[in-house]
Amino acid sequence: TEMGLKPERSIEVVSFADEEGWRFTKGLFGSRGILGKLEPGELQRKDKDGITREQALIDFGCDPQKFRESEYKPGSIHCFLELHIEQGPVLDIANKPIGVVSGISGPLWLTVKLKGMAGHAGSVPMAIRKDALVGAAEIIVALNEIANQIPGAPTVGTVGTINVFPASRNIIPEEVTFTVDLRDIDLERRHRYEKQLMDKIESITQKHQLTYEISEDTN
C-alpha cells in the first residue's frame, strides 16, 4: 500500500452487473458464477429485445468461455464484504453517512395479463363494458393498500411496467399486461400478502367480467 502496509490476506475487488436479474429475469448471475453454480441455459436467456445473455456479454467485451477461470473454490475466501449504495432516501433523511444491512427483502416478480373486450369509446355503455385497464387500475391500487397494511413495515409493492392493447384513445382497452414486484424481509408475511393479492385479482376480474393469466418470473 501507499503507507507500506502489507495485509495479512490478499484483497480482491469484484463488481457484479444486474444482480436483481431485471434484464434476463434470473438474478445473481455474477455471484452464482464465481461459486460455480450457474445452471444450464443461463447464457441462452433472452431479454425483451431478443438479445441473449451470451451475446450481451460478448458485446460488453467478455468471453463467456472463460467463466470457469473465475470460479472460487469453497474455503478459498476468508470473508466477503459488500459495499452498496442505499438506492433509497432513508439515510439521507436521517442524515446518516452509512448503514449496516440486517436483512434483504426478497422479491416476488409476477406478470399479470388481463383480457376484456374492446369497443368504441363513444358507443359502448358503461354498464356493459369489459375494460381491462379499469380492472388493472383497481388491482394496482389493491397492491398499494396491501403493502401499506402495517405502517413502518419493510413491505413494498410496485407495478413498474404496464402495456395496453390496442392503446388508442377512442377504443376501450381489451388487454392489459403489467408487472408486480412485491418484497418483504418477512417471507411468511410476503406469502400472506401474495395470497391477498391473488384474491383481489380474482374478485376484481370477476366484477369486470375479465379473464386473467399470471406468471411468476423466475429470479
Question: Whereabouts are the PLM-identified features?
Answer:
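Short strand-loop-helix active-site module centered on a catalytic nucleophile
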Residues: 1, 13, 136
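A structural signal for isolated positions on well-ordered beta-strands in alpha/beta enzyme cores
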Residues: 12-14, 213
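Flexible hinge/switch segments at interdomain interfaces of large molecular machines
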Residues: 172-173, 208-210
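An extended, acidic, His-containing surface patch that forms the Zn2+-binding/catalytic region
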Residues: 213-219
